[in-house]
UniProtKB/Swiss-Prot annotation:
This is Uncharacterized protein pXO1-111/BXA0163/GBAA_pXO1_0163. It is a single-pass membrane protein. The chain crosses the membrane at residues 181-203. The keyword Thylakoid does not apply. It comes from Bacillus anthracis. GO terms for cellular component: plasma membrane. It is found in: Cell membrane. Keywords: Cell membrane, Membrane, Plasmid, Transmembrane, Transmembrane helix. It holds the Pfam family PA_Ig-like.
Amino acid sequence: MESLGINNIYNALDRIKLNAKMNILVRDPYHYDNNGNIVGVDDSYLKNAYKQILNWSSDGVSLNLDEDVNQALSGYMLQIKKPSNHLTNSPVTITLAGKDSGVGELYRVLSDGTGFLDFNKFDENWRSLVDPGDDVYVYAVTKEDFNAVTRDENGNIANKLKNTLVLSGKIKEINIKTTNINIFVVFMFIIYLLFYIISSTVFAKSCNCILIYVEVSQLMNSVFY
């Protein structure tokens, strides 16, 4: 894996060019490599995840995390799909201003224009990261426990409790299309204006007819009486 330049889950995600049917983000801030660097997950998990990613569909995905994971994503996850003219050559990390809880502070733009924002609570601050023309998808994420066969450092096989990060299918889609919205607003305004003009014209004609009728009636009354 190292020879391919893939030493953590983020590199793997960038390498395989995630699309709308393969949406995964794993963050384990307590997992380090031999040099003390945070790597997210080890090679053994990464190889398994790499295979699973290629086979998963949009119906939902399940991530098996190491048993010593102390913190895992839980709540909601946003996928922000940038248009082709916003593509970046390398991942970009943005820290949200005013965040002191450490929740919702990571936003990544992958090299294919797909971004992810993860947080434990739904936060409206994500809107500051979305530009006109972006497509935003919302996924529900939960953490579950299950029994799995594992291998320890000595090579011994045992059945231990593992944490599973479950990513649901797409539960909500938000289209940020200001151009389309503006066109729609202008179109509705034109319809309203035409309706107002027609209504005003008809109303004016009706008023004129009423005035003429009243004047004729008064004239007839003065003649015959």
